[in-house]
């Protein structure tokens, strides 16, 4: 029997918050325009007792700054809890030091970003991609959406892919243009996505959690001869990411009927060759 589709009217921030709530056990938050409503939705749902995909209520903790939120994400991930945060602009820049650590330790998580101009000679709260482009070198994979429906679909891809690949993701979309655009979209629900989680990868993530009964040393100092080899070994994880993302795009397409791919081609191809 075909499941009847459910539609809602929402903006991009609500779509991202809806998906992230499903896959998160902890949300470390700090408000910054135009991402603030994502955290507000998650806080509201947690207070109302809404259950995530694991049948639990998300633990929401507001920190003293975006840097504190990123540090809380890092610590929570090390403790074996799936964790997320929401930010933009200078707030994202404050998270960069922890992003290097999260990516370097292959901790699966998603940062949801409503991309916004960075303040320079003056403050500007409107959208561009200066903030997310400042994070390309951190080791986070990136997914970008251009519509509210894409936010709903691709946010799910980001959360599913990060669990399987261990590579953290920045999931971003244009501040205001998409974050506050209100559209009628198809809603993905817990039962749609629960079966797509790689349970073995999730169990392995939890087994790697810091535990006083099974102590390990992490973040030690290394000499260059070892350090560069360990950095090179990371490439195996990153090389696997495109195939994993495409796999989950295909799975979401099966549920929704909307095609998603790593590359979508539009228009005509013009080929010219020199005269003989």
Where are these regions (language model features)?
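Conformationally flexible catalytic loops at phosphate/diphosphate-handling active centers
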Residues: 54-58, 169-264
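Generic recognition of flexible, low-complexity loop/linker segments
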Residues: 15-17, 159, 259-265
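Conserved small/polar residues in nucleotide/adenosyl-binding loops
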Residues: 271-276
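Conserved thiamine diphosphate
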Residues: 125-175, 187
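Hydrophobic alpha-helical scaffolding
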Residues: 6, 10, 28, 63, ...
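Flexible, charged surface loops at secondary-structure boundaries
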Residues: 20-22, 266-270
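Thiamine diphosphate
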Residues: 1-134, 139, 156, 175-176
């Amino acid at each position: 029997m075909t499941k009847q589709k459910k539609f809602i009217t929402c903006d991009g921030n609500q779509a991202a918050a809806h998906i992230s709530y499903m896959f998160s056990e902890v949300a470390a938050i700090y408000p910054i325009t135009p991402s603030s409503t994502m955290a507000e939705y998650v806080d509201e749902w947690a207070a109302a007792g809404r259950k995530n995909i694991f049948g639990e209520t998300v633990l929401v903790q507001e920190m003293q700054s975006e840097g504190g939120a990123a540090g809380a994400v890092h610590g929570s991930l090390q403790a074996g809890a799936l964790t997320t945060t929401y930010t933009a602009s200078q707030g994202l820049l404050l998270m960069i030091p922890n992003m290097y650590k999260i990516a370097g330790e292959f901790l699966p998580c998603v940062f949801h970003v409503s991309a916004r101009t960075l303040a320079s000679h003056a403050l500007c709260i409107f959208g561009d991609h200066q903030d997310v482009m400042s994070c390309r070198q951190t080791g986070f994979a990136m997914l970008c959406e251009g519509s509210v429906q894409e936010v709903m679909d691709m946010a799910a891809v980001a959360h599913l892919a990060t669990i399987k690949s261990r590579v953290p993701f920045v999931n971003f979309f244009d501040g205001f243009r998409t974050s506050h655009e209100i559209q009628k979209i198809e809603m993905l629900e817990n039962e749609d996505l629960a079966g797509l989680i790689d349970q073995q990868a999730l169990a392995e993530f939890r087994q790697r959690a810091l535990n006083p009964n099974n102590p390990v040393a992490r973040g030690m100092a290394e000499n260059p001869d070892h350090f560069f080899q360990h950095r090179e070994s990371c490439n195996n994880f990153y090389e696997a990411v495109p195939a994993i993302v495409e796999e989950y795009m295909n799975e979401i397409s099966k549920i929704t009927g909307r095609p998603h791919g790593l590359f979508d081609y539009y228009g005509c191809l013009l080929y010219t060759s020199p005269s003989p």
